[in-house]
């Protein structure tokens, strides 16, 4: 059995405690949480099922395919969190800011718009390709002396005592290993192995929808505008992306690449994945000329949409985090940003625990964390479901109500700042 502590590393000068954390799941949330802990001087080991690629600064600088990636909208609060740990300068060159947000419905009079000048903010957030975000986070983790990586490892068991939590995992060489620490944080996705091993149930709701994601090119520059469009074909979101070689935040290089998220009925996605012309023409029909002409699409992917909420997020010395705790509908782009706020709060609480000389796996403190995050989580979950229901329901009365609501939102000055702050993650 391996017990992970700062002593396991050659105790870097910024390590403030011999207590440590195991993070299962090395996606964007797991990688980010490890970096948040390291910034606080807390050591961690990240255990990931898949094998990581060997990357370095030279390989990292190579551009991914011009029209081939999934993307994430980073709220202003998420950007602030990355700024706090000194990582945003690395991320910013591959992120594209959102200066304006437009919401409308095809064939209806409802329309609303948010502008950064009106709200007196630098931007509402940033859009970044998942490939670049993952590479930058992984590179930062690999270079951090307080973070150890174990990849190609499948967790098979979780055990707890009064003072430690232990995971057992199988390696790619079919060798069984164990690892112990003061706390385990499970960031291993919607179908979380750790959550299931602990017997934590979930509340699931199948929306009967699929999300088609991809990157398109238009003949009109995006000008840093994000567009949410509700059409009979389903909700459509088009977000600005960096250009092929340029900096997406350079006003002189407003690009022509846009990220697309299209919510359609389950079963309809196959035809749009296979037929680029059909995909582009249907997008055009849904958007009109608001985004210009859609002239090219990259490889597209699709995944079914199901809301998954863990019955509890703390079990002994284990915290359930990220999509393992709450997998949400992507229509409002809030899922990853909610996870980042969770991670930021927990890292801060663990650091405070260390400064008091107390156990970072103390269940009472972890229960306090779960309670502290409930309000924000419930608000975001309700908002996502309200948008899905409100803008997909065919009832004429509901359609009229949502159009009136859009107009009211656009015309009432006191409401806009409130909604903008919620969307940016600055107010919960």
Task: Please place each PLM-identified region on the residue numbering.
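C-terminal helical "tail/cap" subdomain of flavin- and related membrane-associated enzymes
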Residues: 6, 348-428
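Beta1/beta-strand and adjacent pyrophosphate-binding region of the FAD-binding site
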Residues: 14-27
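Conserved N-terminal helical subregion
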Residues: 16-18, 76-84, 89-197, 205-210
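Glycine-rich FAD pyrophosphate-binding loop
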Residues: 24, 38-68
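N-terminal Rossmann-fold NAD(P) dinucleotide-binding loop
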Residues: 30-31
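Conserved FAD/dinucleotide-binding core of flavoprotein oxidoreductases
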Residues: 113, 231-303
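Central beta-strand plus flanking loop segment that forms part of the substrate or channel wall
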Residues: 191-226, 236, 264-268
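FAD/FMN-dependent oxidoreductases across multiple families
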Residues: 270-355, 361
């Amino acid at each position: 059995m391996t017990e992970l502590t700062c002593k396991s590393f050659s105790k870097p000068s910024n390590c403030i405690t011999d207590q440590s954390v195991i993070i299962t799941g090395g996606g964007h949330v797991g990688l980010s949480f490890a970096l948040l802990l390291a910034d606080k001087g807390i050591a961690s080991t990240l255990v990931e099922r898949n094998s990581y690629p060997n990357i370095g600064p030279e390989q990292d600088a190579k551009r991914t395919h011009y029209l081939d990636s999934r993307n994430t909208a980073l709220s202003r609060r998420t950007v602030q969190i990355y700024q706090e740990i000194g990582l945003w300068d690395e991320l910013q060159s591959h992120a594209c800011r959102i200066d304006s947000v437009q919401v409308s419905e095809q064939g209806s009079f409802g329309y609303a718009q948010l502008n950064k000048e009106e709200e007196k903010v630098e931007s509402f957030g940033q859009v970044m390709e998942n490939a670049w975000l993952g590479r930058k986070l992984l590179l930062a983790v690999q270079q951090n002396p307080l973070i150890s990586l174990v990849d190609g490892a499948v967790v098979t068991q979780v055990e707890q005592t009064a003072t430690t939590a232990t995971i057992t995992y199988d390696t790619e060489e079919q060798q069984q290993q164990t690892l112990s620490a003061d706390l385990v944080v499970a960031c291993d996705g919607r179908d979380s192995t750790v959550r299931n091993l602990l017997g934590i149930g979930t509340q699931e709701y199948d929306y009967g929808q699929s999300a088609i994601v991809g990157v398109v090119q238009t003949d009109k520059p995006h000008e840093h505008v994000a567009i949410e469009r509700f059409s009979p074909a389903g909700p459509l979101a088009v977000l600005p992306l960096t250009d092929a070689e340029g900096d997406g935040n350079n006003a002189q290089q407003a690009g022509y690449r846009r990220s697309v998220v299209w919510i359609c009925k389950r079963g309809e996605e196959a035809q749009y994945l296979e037929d680029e012309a059909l995909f582009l023409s249907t997008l055009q029909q849904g958007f009109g000329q608001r985004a210009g002409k859609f002239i090219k699409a990259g490889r597209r992917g699709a995944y079914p949409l199901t809301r998954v909420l863990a019955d509890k997020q703390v079990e002994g010395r284990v915290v359930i985090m990220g999509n393992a705790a709450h997998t949400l509908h992507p229509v409002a782009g809030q899922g990853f940003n909610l996870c980042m706020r969770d991670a930021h709060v927990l890292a801060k609480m663990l650091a405070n625990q260390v400064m008091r000389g107390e156990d970072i796996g103390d269940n009472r403190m972890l229960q306090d964390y779960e309670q502290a995050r409930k309000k924000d989580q419930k608000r975001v979950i309700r908002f996502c479901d309200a948008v899905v229901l409100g803008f997909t329901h065919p009832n004429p009365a509901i359609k009229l109500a949502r159009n009136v609501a859009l107009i009211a939102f656009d015309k009432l000055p006191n409401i806009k700042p409130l909604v903008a702050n919620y969307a940016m993650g600055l107010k919960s």
